[in-house]
């Protein structure tokens, strides 16, 4: 009975440990502390690994590795085409490229997990968020004036207080009074390391 209690305590500690990012390489991640599951959307978390339990991340990693047949850490058109052939489906290479186009860059493990996180947790895609900011960018410059964004946040829709704005502004890409919403969306969707 005591051994069972010790194991339960050990498992509980693992569940409470902070998430560590799994490597983007094809090898399975080393033993890591299990992330705390969260219902928070990716754009609030900034780290897709925090959305899943460790065993779920491992399952996604195994699926990624199975698809990444050339073991280069990237799922490319050839990898995806080969998987379709293995399951007996002939798919036009153009269709495969379109499927991969949803990922703005090369589809490494982090992006692969992000796509699943968006689908499973119902968060908006990078493009959707970027387009929402672009609605306010009438001149299509890729940035908004800092004071204009602050005014929108305090007076329109869900109104934010000064402390909430200060929190957002800590990480916001602002230079010379210009809020770069393209970089901001990338930051909230992929995290700081992939700016």
Swiss-Prot record:
Residues 1-17 have a biased composition (Basic and acidic residues). SMART domains: EFh (SM00054). Signal peptide: none annotated. It comes from the Eukaryota. InterPro entries: EF-hand-dom_pair, EF_Hand_1_Ca_BS, EF_hand_dom, Myosin_RLC. Ca(2+) binds at residues 68, 70, 72, 79. One of its GO terms (cellular component) is myosin complex. One of its GO terms (molecular function) is calcium ion binding. Gene3D superfamilies: EF-hand. Pfam families: EF-hand_6. Keywords: Calcium, Metal-binding, Motor protein, Muscle protein, Myosin, Repeat. Changing residue 168 to L: In 20% of the molecules. Plays an important role in regulation of muscle cell contractile activity. This is Myosin regulatory light chain, striated muscle, 25 kDa isoform. It comes from Lumbricus terrestris (Common earthworm).
């Amino acid at each position: 009975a005591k051994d069972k209690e010790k194991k339960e305590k050990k498992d509980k500690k693992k569940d409470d440990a902070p998430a560590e990012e799994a490597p983007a390489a094809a090898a399975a991640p080393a033993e890591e502390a299990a992330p705390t599951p969260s219902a928070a959307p990716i754009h609030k978390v900034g780290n897709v690994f925090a959305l899943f339990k460790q065993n779920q991340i491992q399952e996604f990693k195994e699926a990624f590795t199975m698809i990444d047949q050339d073991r280069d850490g990237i799922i490319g058109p050839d990898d995806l085409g080969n998987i379709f052939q293995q399951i007996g489906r002939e798919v036009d290479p153009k269709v495969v490229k379109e499927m991969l186009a949803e990922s703005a860059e090369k589809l490494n493990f982090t992006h692969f997990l992000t796509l699943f996180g968006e689908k499973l947790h119902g968060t908006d895609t990078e493009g959707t968020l970027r387009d929402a900011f672009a609605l306010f960018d009438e001149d299509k410059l890729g940035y908004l004036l800092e004071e204009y964004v602050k005014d929108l946040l305090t007076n329109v829709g869900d109104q934010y207080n000064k402390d909430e704005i200060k929190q957002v502004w800590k990480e916001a890409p602002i230079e010379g009074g210009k809020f770069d919403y393209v970089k901001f969306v990338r930051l909230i969707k992929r995290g700081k390391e992939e700016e």
